[in-house]
């Protein structure tokens, strides 16, 4: 049975999240958690939290055995961009783009 977990409006760019997501795509859940535990990136903690939520959903909703779970699908979409202006010299300004993203993880046995 497929179980989905989503984390939306993450305050990190999709590009940074995809670096971590690509390392665990298609792996068993236990192996993916080990990889995320030793990955030294902020986005690894966010992906780990969402993966643990997917595991809990599978265990609670579908009574799945967590030892057999595998990541079937994992992807990151870009979310809305918060735009800010930073004043610069001589009356100019720069745009600051605060990017967000949406993470979706699908696990199955």
UniProtKB/Swiss-Prot annotation:
It comes from the Bacteria. One of its GO terms (biological process) is translation. Signal peptide: none annotated. Keywords: Ribonucleoprotein, Ribosomal protein, RNA-binding, rRNA-binding. One of its GO terms (molecular function) is rRNA binding. It holds the Pfam family Ribosomal_L22. GO terms for cellular component: cytosolic large ribosomal subunit. Part of the 50S ribosomal subunit. NCBIfam families: rplV_bact. Belongs to the universal ribosomal protein uL22 family. This is Large ribosomal subunit protein uL22. It comes from Blochmanniella pennsylvanica (strain BPEN).
């Amino acid at each position: 049975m497929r179980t989905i977990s989503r984390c939306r409006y993450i305050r990190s760019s999709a590009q940074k999240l995809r670096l971590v997501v690509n390392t665990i795509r298609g792996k068993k859940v236990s192996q993916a958690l080990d990889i995320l535990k030793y990955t030294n990136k902020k986005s690894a903690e966010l992906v780990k939290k969402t993966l643990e939520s997917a595991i809990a959903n599978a265990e609670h909703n579908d009574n799945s055995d967590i030892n057999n779970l595998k990541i079937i699908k994992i992807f990151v979409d870009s979310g809305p961009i918060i735009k800010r202006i930073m004043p610069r010299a001589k009356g100019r300004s720069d745009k600051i783009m605060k990017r967000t993203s949406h993470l979706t993880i699908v696990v199955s046995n």
